[in-house]
Amino acid sequence: MMFRDQVGILAGWFKGWNECEQTVALLSLLKRVTRTQARFLQLCLEHSLADCNDIHLLESEANSAAIVSQWQQESKEKVVSLLLSHLPLLQPGNTEAKSEYMRLLQKVLAYSIESNAFIEESRQLLSYALIHPATTLEDRNALALWLSHLEERLASGFRSRPEPSYHSRQGSDEWGGPAELGPGEAGPGWQDKPPRENGHVPFHPSSSVPPAINSIGSNANTGLPCQIHPSPLKRSMSLIPTSPQVPGEWPSPEELGARAAFTTPDHAPLSPQSSVASSGSEQTEEQGSSRNTFQEDGSGMKDVPSWLKSLRLHKYAALFSQMSYEEMMTLTEQHLESQNVTKGARHKIALSIQKLRERQSVLKSLEKDVLEGGNLRNALQELQQIIITPIKAYSVLQATVAAATTTPTAKDGAPGEPPLPGAEPPLAHPGTDKGTEAKDPPAVENYPPPPAPAPTDGSEPAPAPVADGDIPSQFTRVMGKVCTQLLVSRPDEENITSYLQLIEKCLTHEAFTETQKKRLLSWKQQVLKLLRTFPRKAALEMQNYRQQKGWAFGSNSLPIAGSVGMGVARRTQRQFPMPPRALPPGRMGLLSPSGIGGVSPRHALTSPSLGGQGRQNLWFANPGGSNSMPSQSRSSVQRTHSLPVHSSPQAILMFPPDCPVPGPDLEINPTLESLCLSMTEHALGDGTDKTSTI
């Protein structure tokens, strides 16, 4: 199908929609354009409206609180018409005029629900208000409840009147009712139609919240009456029949407080069925999709549904779908109570939101734990829990702070170029990090570069502090510290797998910047390189070692692994205690002479009889890739034999003559082969007595 044909089809649909539907659809499409496209469209619209004096006059009226307040003296038809034509022109930030609109909107919606009149117009007004940039979180939450009341009113069939047609451009004769309260045509033409009622009773002069409503709502802020008005409607447990009313009379404050909502008592508050996003009508589906922050790029809310599901709070997703990230982070129990969230649920939501606010301090604590020898597996589990929570890009979350602090971070390197390993040692001293955590000057993308294989003491600059609220940068910093420990400590397959999974999630997460993702990618490549240093067969044998870990020496593996005499080995063991399956008993028996202490032969490289410091660093940069394979040399010693575990030290000693032969393993380079050979000869040269003590 040609492009012009597609445009023709879209134009045909567009002509069939009413003005409100067209507006919602256009806004939904505009949210998908780039900034350049949006600016171009703005220029086109401004140019076309430059000579349109009528729209300027209408906009002036729409933003005058005094004029809007005078509409209360008009007929209901006139008020609905004025709201539809002026509400879209309200300027964001005009709180005084907005309050007047909300007061009128409250009265229109209450009357519409009570009398089954102006249903379609009420839907359109709700649509405009829900997508309007001038409305706040409280406004939208209250309006979403009004919309659910309106649709429940139609679905419940409380009265026998037929449901009106969806398009407001159809004739008003379809709006049944003894009082003949139908509106005219939708759009600006309503202003030209005279009211069908010759007489009317004006609005009640009270513009404040009725006492009956004030007694129920828990929100002390009564600037916007509609914020708490749905509460009495929702809490009502019985259907109170309405008293006969003069056709032109708006409901009094007492009636508004006493009348019940048209819903069943067992209907759960804020259920997905009553949300805007799950509405059954076409127009509200469009509106729901345009207002659903779960689907907006850069909103930070895309992970909220899965996060709520993990908390078993997914039934309240509709409440969060109308919020921005910043609004969600400021939720309180009092606000949730005003939205009729049950006591247990609002307490759980409030606690979960509080945990979201504490993520940065948790990440700082994790960073210190990793540096000071904490359990790496526990740290990775904490990171897994944090990455599934809603995270917003810091540059979007605090754009002004980010713009002011972009310059100090230029030292991190040019974007798009992953830093060279060793450019800045990532293994920071705990004291240094403690000093920087006490300060919170704003910064952007403050995370360490890819970890160096062997950090050099004394040459390490103090890491830049991470700004408050910059979760992606803090998360990336911890990932850098974890990568360092993975490279210099005894390898653990589960830890490495968990780390790679975390990196994959970060690489596809919208909150992380391109620079952060490139650094994470460089760390991923280093960890993958670590895994590739072992033969494939050794990796396959790992499962056999796990199953047979108790055959020869059982639980002796951990005490032996902890009896390291070398300082580096002690630090490594203290940082990351290995599980019982960490070292295969047979291989530990081969590597337990006095100079090694029963641990990985890579620790033996610190011995003066072996290679120099440079070769030691090379070895530490390329350790093994699983927790049952502490070094490459062990795999080369055992690789040519099919027995995964030897049952006695005597059986172990039968194999050393073949150890120097690397076999057909092409993955081990000659340098590592020579290291394996010299290490094995050194271990066997101490005799068999100490070997048999395992």
Swiss-Prot record:
Compartment(s) of residence: Cytoplasm; Nucleus
Residues bearing PTM Asymmetric dimethylarginine: 602
Residues with the Phosphoserine modification: 172, 271, 278-279, 281, 555, 557, 563, 592, 600, 628
Pfam families xref list: SAM_1
Comp. bias (Low complexity): 200-211, 278-290
Region entry Disordered, spans: 158-301, 407-471, 607-643
GO CC, any one term: P-body
Annotated GO MF terms: mRNA binding; RNA binding; translation repressor activity
Tissue expression remark: Widely expressed in embryonic and adult tissues.
Entry keyword Nucleus: yes
Gene Ontology annotations of biological process type: nuclear-transcribed mRNA poly(A) tail shortening
Main localization of the protein described in the UniProt heading: cytoplasm
Record's function text: Has transcriptional repressor activity. Overexpression inhibits the transcriptional activities of AP-1, p53/TP53 and CDKN1A.
Similarity-based family: Belongs to the SMAUG family.
Protein name in UniProt: Protein Smaug homolog 2
Organism: Homo sapiens
